[in-house]
């Protein structure tokens, strides 16, 4: 396997970044340069939430000039929402190849990619152009899902990997929040002027500017990587023969006294990785072995259930949902508050992720979503859409967001890398990620249509799925907190030795 060697460590321009203790240390600086991509991830997923109706008007998707919710607009909006997730499926599959050329290199590619994609989206004048641009945006998001967590994992202190890993999710939620916040400048939707809806010059500019914004964030990311954070990760440098370069970065992350231990840990990890590759089982081969097939299927089911909590319907389509419960002028304000809660409630996850077991958090998240949606469904069936019931529905969405932000959101991605043994980790985790994106498409694509029919249908579906998820986690999912790297609580040492040999476990 040919890997591009990037000997990018230079003596000049890097010495100003010194080791510092605490959470906001050297690692945090490097992580921040990567988390700008996480911000773009969240922003791109949510940006359509507040501007769809303006696109409908400018592109004239409805023959009636006073309507923005005709069948054609709902269908095209559904395609635009789902296209991001379809693109992400493709991008996540390609990302494993991209990171082989360097973790920092992959971030540079992502930032450059989003400059062009954001400009293309902002200048779109036809449905097919904006659909193509949104597919490309999704492809970039797919690249981010692998590249950023890998960069963070390899650029952080071993005792803080969990906390820093949550920063990826934190910046995703911050991007979601900013996307909805910027929608406030557009007011409460397109205004009817006489016998038709007409957009003001500001409205026509602003929705395009919102698509353009990731270009500015990407330029900032490129500047940070070129001017300040020029180094590749210590793992990548060591793996490609630049041991001295790896030492220099580790001094900044760990301090001079702990470099030898950190370097030895990298060497051991690389040796284990090589052994795992030599002994690796292909996904098809692993699926033929009952013990491996079991853990692969469990991971895929767990990953799929995350989307069936309804998180991406709220993130990508909260404005449409709140139209069923609120006056028009309060919709975007409530979406801003909801995304702010989503952002703020990710902070507790930074501190509890290493204190509470993964399984406990997953179970708690499911209970939270059930308590959020099930009472709403019952109330709407008994009393109908009264003001009190609508208020309960809104409160339910907030409880769901809080529950997800401190549990299923960040925990799933950590768990998927802890549940699989090293010989199938890469391929199995990739498959689980693919299933997650496919389930997102299944949930998001029809959400516009179902919301128009009845929000209760969605709430009932999410409630039932979370009840099933709770039972599934309770009886089939095992705790992974504190486990050894490369092992699995689902497959015994003897079972692994039987299939890959004693010397390679």
Swiss-Prot record:
<feature type="binding site">
    <location>
        <position position="312"/>
    </location>
    <ligand>
        <name>alpha-D-glucose</name>
    </ligand>
</feature>
<keyword id="KW-0812">Transmembrane</keyword>
<feature type="topological domain" description="Cytoplasmic">
    <location>
        <begin position="100"/>
        <end position="104"/>
    </location>
</feature>
<comment type="subunit">
    <text>Homodimer.</text>
</comment>
<keyword id="KW-0472">Membrane</keyword>
<feature type="transmembrane region" description="Helical">
    <location>
        <begin position="79"/>
        <end position="99"/>
    </location>
</feature>
<feature type="transmembrane region" description="Helical">
    <location>
        <begin position="333"/>
        <end position="353"/>
    </location>
</feature>
<dbReference type="Pfam" id="PF00083">
    <property type="entry name" value="Sugar_tr"/>
</dbReference>
<dbReference type="InterPro" id="IPR005828">
    <property type="entry name" value="MFS_sugar_transport-like"/>
</dbReference>
<feature type="topological domain" description="Extracellular">
    <location>
        <begin position="380"/>
        <end position="393"/>
    </location>
</feature>
<feature type="binding site">
    <location>
        <position position="342"/>
    </location>
    <ligand>
        <name>beta-D-glucose</name>
    </ligand>
</feature>
<feature type="topological domain" description="Extracellular">
    <location>
        <begin position="187"/>
        <end position="208"/>
    </location>
</feature>
<feature type="binding site">
    <location>
        <position position="169"/>
    </location>
    <ligand>
        <name>beta-D-glucose</name>
    </ligand>
</feature>
<keyword id="KW-1015">Disulfide bond</keyword>
<feature type="topological domain" description="Extracellular">
    <location>
        <begin position="452"/>
        <end position="456"/>
    </location>
</feature>
<dbReference type="GO" id="GO:0022857">
    <property type="term" value="F:transmembrane transporter activity"/>
</dbReference>
<feature type="transmembrane region" description="Helical">
    <location>
        <begin position="394"/>
        <end position="414"/>
    </location>
</feature>
<feature type="transmembrane region" description="Helical">
    <location>
        <begin position="431"/>
        <end position="451"/>
    </location>
</feature>
<feature type="binding site">
    <location>
        <position position="413"/>
    </location>
    <ligand>
        <name>alpha-D-glucose</name>
    </ligand>
</feature>
<feature type="binding site">
    <location>
        <position position="306"/>
    </location>
    <ligand>
        <name>beta-D-glucose</name>
    </ligand>
</feature>
<protein>
    <recommendedName>
        <fullName>Hexose transporter 1</fullName>
    </recommendedName>
</protein>
<feature type="topological domain" description="Extracellular">
    <location>
        <begin position="49"/>
        <end position="78"/>
    </location>
</feature>
<feature type="transmembrane region" description="Helical">
    <location>
        <begin position="457"/>
        <end position="477"/>
    </location>
</feature>
<feature type="topological domain" description="Extracellular">
    <location>
        <begin position="316"/>
        <end position="332"/>
    </location>
</feature>
<feature type="disulfide bond">
    <location>
        <begin position="62"/>
        <end position="70"/>
    </location>
</feature>
<feature type="topological domain" description="Cytoplasmic">
    <location>
        <begin position="478"/>
        <end position="505"/>
    </location>
</feature>
<feature type="transmembrane region" description="Helical">
    <location>
        <begin position="135"/>
        <end position="155"/>
    </location>
</feature>
<feature type="topological domain" description="Cytoplasmic">
    <location>
        <begin position="415"/>
        <end position="430"/>
    </location>
</feature>
<feature type="topological domain" description="Cytoplasmic">
    <location>
        <begin position="230"/>
        <end position="294"/>
    </location>
</feature>
<dbReference type="GO" id="GO:0005886">
    <property type="term" value="C:plasma membrane"/>
</dbReference>
<dbReference type="InterPro" id="IPR020846">
    <property type="entry name" value="MFS_dom"/>
</dbReference>
<comment type="similarity">
    <text>Belongs to the major facilitator superfamily. Sugar transporter (TC 2.A.1.1) family.</text>
</comment>
<feature type="transmembrane region" description="Helical">
    <location>
        <begin position="295"/>
        <end position="315"/>
    </location>
</feature>
<feature type="binding site">
    <location>
        <position position="312"/>
    </location>
    <ligand>
        <name>beta-D-glucose</name>
    </ligand>
</feature>
<dbReference type="InterPro" id="IPR005829">
    <property type="entry name" value="Sugar_transporter_CS"/>
</dbReference>
<feature type="transmembrane region" description="Helical">
    <location>
        <begin position="166"/>
        <end position="186"/>
    </location>
</feature>
<keyword id="KW-1133">Transmembrane helix</keyword>
<keyword id="KW-1003">Cell membrane</keyword>
<keyword id="KW-0762">Sugar transport</keyword>
<feature type="transmembrane region" description="Helical">
    <location>
        <begin position="105"/>
        <end position="125"/>
    </location>
</feature>
<feature type="transmembrane region" description="Helical">
    <location>
        <begin position="359"/>
        <end position="379"/>
    </location>
</feature>
<feature type="binding site">
    <location>
        <position position="306"/>
    </location>
    <ligand>
        <name>alpha-D-glucose</name>
    </ligand>
</feature>
